[in-house]
Structure formats: structure tokens, C-alpha cells
């Protein structure tokens, strides 16, 4: 009979640079290895991720699987077929877990029997220290899933972050079911973000309650290229795209013309000249705040346009079929 209490599940796409750091940290886990296992899904990587994963099989209770269809949803759904134990920890391939990470989640689940969704502390592991404008004005939760300011206790599932979350296996069902349009998806340049949030919100809608604790901790590796303005603003656009899917209630009562929310469209148009001008000035908090808001609005409009295009294609195909 299996002694496994916990399954750690994650997918990786071209994660060869961060996987060794993550897996080395898991080798230091304080929980006996017969009581937990790792299910890692290689999501069609083109680097040496598979070789890195396989090289740790003798040191860790590690199972490696391959999902050729690009997209985190498909990779994790494959991983769901191999879960064991009462608790499932979902994470990413770029975290550094504390030695007692798994034990802390088990303790949390025991201490909070009325909750079925659990979040843990996420602090940064910067490859390059961010500039003051980013530290002072950037939403570090949206950008890097950091949650150091989140108090311990019951929370909305919307505050559960993908790099450090756990779920009672009994509430999960058979697959990682979220909206098909949500990323990560390596096949497109820009995708709507928010897949982890959508997954937790669906479980909450079905009756599960969420709890945050600062005790199960990970450090999230933030790559050097992720602290420059260009990457951050692209992240803002992805966030805006994701809002349309994950939080449709924010737009239900908005006046729309041609499927677009008029207020967002007008603000975006009015701020285009200011955005052009402010880019001529040095990096600063004022510049960042203006460009960030514009990027989020651009993402919102982009997603509404995408959905309108999809709807029109569906209508045309249905008319043609008749």
C-alpha cells in the first residue's frame, strides 16, 4: 500500500536553467521521501529540460511525463492522472522551496479542516535587483506572484498564486479544467494570463474555501530579463487580456458598442498621445504608472476584439452550414 501523502505537480517548458535549483531544493526536503512524490510534465520543451528532470530520478521520488500539446492546461491534465495522496501541491518550475515546505502544507491542511484550498508565502529570488520605479510602483503580485503583504487567514481564491498552492485531492476532479483561452501558451506571443486564478475560483464556486499561511514558503526565481520595462508592460497587457476571461463580472454592466467597452476604448484613445510623449522621458514612477495603465487597457481591448472575431467566425460558419 502506498505511503504517499502528497503529490507535487508542475509542468515545465524550456525550464533547464531553473529546474536544477528547484530540484536541488527539493532534495533537502525534511519529509521522508516515501511520503511524497513529484509529477513533472515536460510540455514539449525544445531544450534539455527532459534530461535535467531524468537526471534527478535517483535522488527524488520523481515521475516524468511528456505532453506534446502546448499549453499548461494540457500538461497538468496529464499530470492529474498520476496523483496520489490526500494533498496536491501545484507549483512552477522556477521556485526554491524551503526544506519544510511539504510538511508545512500537511500541517496546514490538518489544522484547517474546513478549508480545501491553501496558499503559501512567495518571496523573490532576484537574478537582478529591480530599479526603484518597479519596486515602488509595480504590482509585484501581478508581475511575479509575490504575496509577502498578504495576511494569514481565510482569503478569496482569487488571491491563490500558482507558484505556491495546495489543494485537497478530493475536490480536484479528473482534470485541470480552465478556460481554453488562458495561458501560458508558448505558441503565441501574447496570451491572457490568469490560469491559476481561474482554476482556484472554479473550485471556490463549487464550495471550497481558501486559506493563506506564511509558513509553507518558496522563493520565486525572477529572471534578469523580467525586470525591464518592456517585459513588464507586456505582462500588463496579458493581465488585461486575462481580466476579460477570469473576471467577466467587471465588464458585464459596462456600455459596449460593437462588443467593446466604450469607457476603456475612450481612455485608451485619449492616452495614446500622452503615452508617446512620456516614452521620451527617463524611466520613472510617473512614466511607469501611465504606461502600465495603458498596457492593461490595451490588453482588455485586445481580448474583446479577439472574442468578437471568434464570435463572428462562428456565426459565419453556422450561416454557411445552413
What does each model-identified segment do?
Residues 234-238, 252-322:
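Non-catalytic, C-terminal membrane-associated alpha-helical segments of glycosyltransferases
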Residues 183-199:
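Acidic donor-binding loop at a coil-to-helix junction in glycosyltransferase catalytic cores
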Residues 42-51, 95:
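A conserved acidic beta->alpha catalytic loop
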Residues 137-157:
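Short, flexible, basic/aromatic active-site loop/helix in glycosyltransferases
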Residues 67-83:
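Glycine-rich, basic loop-to-helix element that forms the pyrophosphate-binding segment
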